[in-house]
């Protein structure tokens, strides 16, 4: 197959305005192509979200490609140089919402699978795709429920490649072999509302909160490790008061987030926060939300297969990294021992005029195909 096979498919996907959670039949298009080469396709839908599980083969090892057909909203369309849902070739790039995140990865893997199956129709092991329309949104009815279903069935995943756009300066320079965890908190500090001229008759929760926050932001939570940077604590929102300048507020709210490494656990972080707040004598309510645990795939069969494929195709020695935000890899890592993320350059993801370099489509497809060969055909 030629590079145009990937280009044609990604154009067809971009033309479908699949803003979370609407799939707009992207997965139906993928299933039709996959069924033609022997994949058994199943739709798992819940809460307005569409998920596709497609598998070819019954033996081990099972190599999975995971991705999402949903995209973020395009934002003001008048800021785009072309319609975000009309795929447009211009100056060596393909423009459109989802071009980089992550419809090109999906198209490249589907074509890679077609080429691989055509060359090796009796290949050992199994290939599967796990595609959701709920990655950019709440992510509660997407990959996580498919993983739960696969666990209940006893399906054993061995390797998973998540097609997130991980490259930075050039295709293949960075892969993600892990991600930090995310832990958020909503802290409500209770005070006593009153007149600013009579502070002795009030209790200002902002004044009480400020020194506690100052201490929290100065803490070194851990030192990280060889795979992860140190855990970070960031305050994202502060709110107090009525808008009037002569009223002491009755309560103050702070929202904060940890991005944490495997050097700390959620329970350890929570305990240290509570210790600080209690020591400062605050009357408070603290609600926690664990967005995801950190995961890590040490060097092994999957990292070697992908890094080797990248080097063979591009000449680059890919860096293994754990930086960045969370992804659906956090759900897959619960049922799959080796998970890695790899895809095109991410400089324009979620931005106006999102784009991918046209010349990267064929190499991306070839890297995915070579990785399948390295994993499934190795002696």
Curated annotation (Swiss-Prot):
Note accompanying the cofactor annotation: Binds 2 Zn(2+) or Co(2+) ions per subunit.
Give the matching InterPro entries.
Bact_exopeptidase_dim_dom, DapE_proteobac, Peptidase_M20, Peptidase_M20_dimer, Peptidase_M20A
Please name the pathway.
Amino-acid biosynthesis; L-lysine biosynthesis via DAP pathway; LL-2,6-diaminopimelate from (S)-tetrahydrodipicolinate (succinylase route): step 3/3
| Annotated catalytic residues | 70, 135 (proton acceptor)
Give the highest taxon in the source lineage: Bacteria
Please give the biological process terms from Gene Ontology that the record holds: diaminopimelate biosynthetic process; L-arginine biosynthetic process; lysine biosynthetic process via diaminopimelate
Which amino acids does the record list as binding Zn(2+) 2? 101, 136, 350
Q: What residues does Zn(2+) 1 bind to?
A: 68, 101, 164
GO MF terms here are: acetylornithine deacetylase activity; cobalt ion binding; succinyl-diaminopimelate desuccinylase activity; zinc ion binding
Catalytic activity reads:
N-succinyl-(2S,6S)-2,6-diaminopimelate + H2O = (2S,6S)-2,6-diaminopimelate + succinate
Q: How does it assemble?
A: Homodimer.
Tell me the function of this protein. Catalyzes the hydrolysis of N-succinyl-L,L-diaminopimelic acid (SDAP), forming succinate and LL-2,6-diaminopimelate (DAP), an intermediate involved in the bacterial biosynthesis of lysine and meso-diaminopimelic acid, an essential component of bacterial cell walls.
Q: Spell out the protein name for this chain.
A: Succinyl-diaminopimelate desuccinylase
